[in-house]
Amino acid sequence: MTTISTTESNPTLPSSGGPLLRAEPDRNCQLCPRLAAFREAARAREARWFNSPVPSFGDPNGRVLIIGLAPGLQGANRTGRPFTGDFAGDLLYATLIEFGFAAGTYQARPDDGLTLVDCRISNAVRCVPPQNRPLPAEISNCRPFLSATIETMPRLRSIVTLGRIAHDTTVKALGLRGSAAPFAHGAIHHAGALKLYDSYHCSRYNTNTGVLTPKMFRSVFARVRADLGAQPNAISTRRPGERRDR
């Protein structure tokens, strides 16, 4: 566990009197020409898909923010909701339901009625990148939206970063020194009033190769829940004896 010093008394709060913070890019955002072109090509092929920057999902007044890498081509880029429609969402939402950060049943579609509890999900890069690999410039271009997302969550206490890229850009969004908060699965870093929790990304590749197991993933959210305390409004739909490692 590390404690990160900053030059600001509270890096999570917007400065008073500053410009209006914009947490979501335009539907036709052109900040990254490569991503815009890839998005347009997807629109031409699949006109019924979302094919736009994917907005954050969940409660802006939540205490937990989960940050992924970017929308998957046939996941969030198709459905318009983070981590919805691909394997990563299967593991993430099952885990959130288990620990009371989501309620309902995840059915891999945005109209499944699933709600987040005290929690919000966003991505380091809001547009789908070719081969799931955003370029450094694209990560930098999207960082102001991440910063605004963080700054417009007044009750935020915990940030869970899924993967090294999400971790690194979050550290930069908070204006912190990366060397003071190296990424490692299960690591916890303090940044003022915030705690940053690191996890390997819950991708199919990571789980298939054993880099991340469901048990390892659940352990991160178990710690978040323990640190925050119980959420009385959380509703778990998991039945006794039901497998959790699907």
Language-model region placement:
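A polyanion-binding, active-site-adjacent surface
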Residues: 14-182, 187-229
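Short, low-complexity, charge-dense intrinsically disordered segments
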Residues: 238-245
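Ala/Thr-enriched low-complexity intrinsically disordered regions
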Residues: 2-7, 12, 234-237
